[in-house]
Structure formats: structure tokens, C-alpha cells
């Protein structure tokens, strides 16, 4: 894959607290460690990975509007259950995306089991901890490679 391929990684509210926030649900790895490992994985595939974590919905929306990425990996965190605006931003740019969650949202409280994104996502990965991000990146690379072959 050429170096012009770009993937945008977005992480929503409270994910800056990974490693110390409810490690029973979210694991012990920090977001910085996860992003570093993903950056290495992307670099090995000759792909550019841009990352933004924000607790502010509008910053995530602005990043989606401004991106020239060919793929988005998003962990909307608590916005999963509340943000029609973030959903509309993703639909508005028509960039394929994968939704990632560290915990198994389906095994948690009922309010966490609804997503405004999953019906529009290329795929959803949940419950696999930090490993889920790596699987999402692999799936994104595979999707982009398949798309390139079809062109």
C-alpha cells in the first residue's frame, strides 16, 4: 500500500484515562501505548495513521469533517449511546469506518448496548481490549487493499 493512504483513529471521552479508569472493564494499557503500537503497525504497512482523542464532541466532528483519510477507526466511548451529531458527521463524509470498544458493551448495562454507529459501520469490534484496535487496523488495511485491487 502506498504511503499516501491515511487512516484516522478517533477516541472519544474518558479514553485519555485508560490504564487507570476501571481496568476491569478497559484494561491496564494506556491510550498512548495503544496508539504507539498501532502507529508501528501502520508504519509497517506503509500507511499514515493520524490520531485524535477528545472529550469534546465538536472536536471529533471537526476532525471527521477535515480529514482526507480513506478510512476511520473510531471508539466513540460514551458518545456511542448519545451522539446523533457524530453519526451524521461520519455519514456526511462517507468514509468507511470500524467501531471499536474495549469492553463487551453487550455484557454491560442496558444503556451501553445501544449504538448510533454500528448499523452504519463496516464492522464493530468489542470486548477484545486493546487487541481490538489492532484487529480494526488489520481489517481497515484489508478493506483498503481489496478496494485498491478493484480499481
Curated annotation (Swiss-Prot):
Biological process terms in GO annotation: amino acid biosynthetic process; aromatic amino acid family biosynthetic process; chorismate biosynthetic process; quinate catabolic process
For this protein, the parts annotated as crossing the membrane are: none
What is the designated name of this protein? Answer: 3-dehydroquinate dehydratase
Give, as one word, the top-level EC class: lyase
Q: Which UniProt keywords apply?
A: Amino-acid biosynthesis, Aromatic amino acid biosynthesis, Lyase
Q: Name one Pfam family in it.
A: DHquinase_II
Job of this protein: Catalyzes a trans-dehydration via an enolate intermediate.
Active site as annotated: 26 (proton acceptor), 101 (proton donor)
Q: Note the Gene3D superfamilies from the entry.
A: Dehydroquinase, class II
Q: Does the keyword Nucleus apply?
A: no
User: Which reaction is catalysed here?
Assistant: 3-dehydroquinate = 3-dehydroshikimate + H2O
Pathway-wise, it operates in: Metabolic intermediate biosynthesis; chorismate biosynthesis; chorismate from D-erythrose 4-phosphate and phosphoenolpyruvate: step 3/7
UniProt GO MF annotations: 3-dehydroquinate dehydratase activity
Q: Which residues bind substrate?
A: 75, 81, 88, 102-103, 112
Quote the subunit structure annotation.
Homododecamer.
- In the UniProt record, the gene name given for this protein reads aroQ
The protein's Enzyme Commission number: 4.2.1.10
- Name the NCBIfam families for this protein: aroQ, PRK05395.1-1, PRK05395.1-2, PRK05395.1-3, PRK05395.1-4
Site (Transition state stabilizer) residue list: 21
Family classification: Belongs to the type-II 3-dehydroquinase family.
Amino acid at each position: 500500500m502506498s504511503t499516501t493512504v491515511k487512516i484516522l483513529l478517533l477516541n472519544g471521552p474518558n479514553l485519555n484515562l485508560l490504564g487507570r479508569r476501571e481496568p476491569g472493564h478497559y484494561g491496564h494499557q494506556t491510550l498512548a501505548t495503544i496508539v504507539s503500537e498501532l502507529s508501528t503497525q501502520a508504519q509497517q504497512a506503509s500507511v499514515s495513521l493520524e490520531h485524535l482523542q477528545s472529550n469534546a464532541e465538536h472536536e471529533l466532528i471537526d476532525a471527521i469533517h477535515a480529514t482526507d483519510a480513506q478510512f476511520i477507526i473510531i471508539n466513540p466511548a460514551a458518545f456511542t449511546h448519545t451522539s446523533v451529531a457524530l453519526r451524521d458527521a461520519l455519514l456526511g463524509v462517507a468514509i468507511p469506518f470500524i467501531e471499536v470498544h474495549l469492553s463487551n458493551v453487550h455484557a454491560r448495562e442496558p444503556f451501553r448496548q445501544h449504538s448510533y454507529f454500528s448499523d452504519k459501520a463496516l464492522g464493530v469490534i468489542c470486548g477484545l481490549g486493546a487487541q481490538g484496535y489492532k484487529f480494526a487496523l488489520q481489517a481497515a488495511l484489508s478493506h483498503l487493499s481489496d478496494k485498491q485491487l478493484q480499481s
